[in-house]
C-alpha cells in the first residue's frame, strides 16, 4: 500500500505551486494473510496516518470493475479505508487511474514510468525512486544467435509503484482544488 500526504495552504495564503507540498510518502507492507486480519491491519494503519497527519481528505485510486471482480477482498479494503476516513469526519474520494494520469501527465494513456517521472520533476526527492517503476529492465542472459532477453524488476515495481500511485492520487486531488 502506498501512502502520500500533500499539504495545501489555506485560502488566502496562495499556492506556491499547483500541487502544494509533498509532506510524506511511504510504502506499507503487510504480513497478515488475506482476510479479516489484513483488513484490520490496513484500517489501523490508515487510522494511524489520519491521526498523525490530520488530513482534510482521504483519497484512493479507485479499483476498476475488473479488479474488483477478480478480488472481492479489494471491495472490503476500500470499504475499510472509507470507514476510517468517515469515522474521523473526513471527506473520502476515489479517483480513477485515468483521471490521475490525466491530471499528472496531461494524458489518460500515460505510462506508470511517465507518471513517476512527472511527479519526480514536481516533487524533490522522488527522482531516486523512478528507476523502480515501470520499465526497469534487467538482462537475464542470451543464447547463441538470439537477442538478449529482459525482465522487469518485479520487487522494485511492486514496492515503488504504489508509492508513486499514491503521490499521483494526492496530486490529482490537490490539482482539482485549483
Language-model-detected regions and their locations in the chain:
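Phosphate- and other anionic-substrate recognition elements at nucleic-acid/protein interfaces
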Residues: 1-178
Amino acid at each position: 500500500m502506498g501512502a502520500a500526504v500533500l499539504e495545501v495552504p489555506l485560502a488566502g495564503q496562495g499556492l506556491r505551486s499547483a500541487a502544494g507540498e509533498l509532506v510524506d510518502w511511504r510504502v506499507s507492507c503487510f504480513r497478515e494473510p488475506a482476510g479479516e486480519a489484513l483488513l484490520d491491519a490496513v484500517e489501523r494503519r490508515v487510522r494511524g496516518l489520519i491521526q498523525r497527519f490530520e488530513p482534510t481528505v482521504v483519497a484512493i485510486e479507485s479499483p476498476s470493475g475488473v479488479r474488483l471482480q477478480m478480488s472481492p477482498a479489494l471491495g472490503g479494503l476500500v470499504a475499510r479505508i472509507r470507514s476510517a476516513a468517515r469515522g474521523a469526519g473526513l471527506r473520502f474520494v476515489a479517483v480513477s487511474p485515468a483521471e490521475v494520469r490525466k491530471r499528472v501527465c496531461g494524458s489518460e494513456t500515460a505510462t506508470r514510468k511517465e507518471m513517476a517521472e512527472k511527479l519526480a520533476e514536481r516533487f524533490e526527492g522522488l527522482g531516486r525512486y523512478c528507476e523502480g517503476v515501470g520499465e526497469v529492465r534487467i538482462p537475464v542472459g542470451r543464447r547463441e544467435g538470439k537477442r538478449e532477453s529482459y525482465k522487469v524488476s518485479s520487487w522494485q515495481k511492486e514496492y515503488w509503484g504504489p508509492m508513486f500511485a499514491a503521490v499521483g492520487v494526492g496530486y490529482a486531488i490537490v490539482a482539482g482544488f485549483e
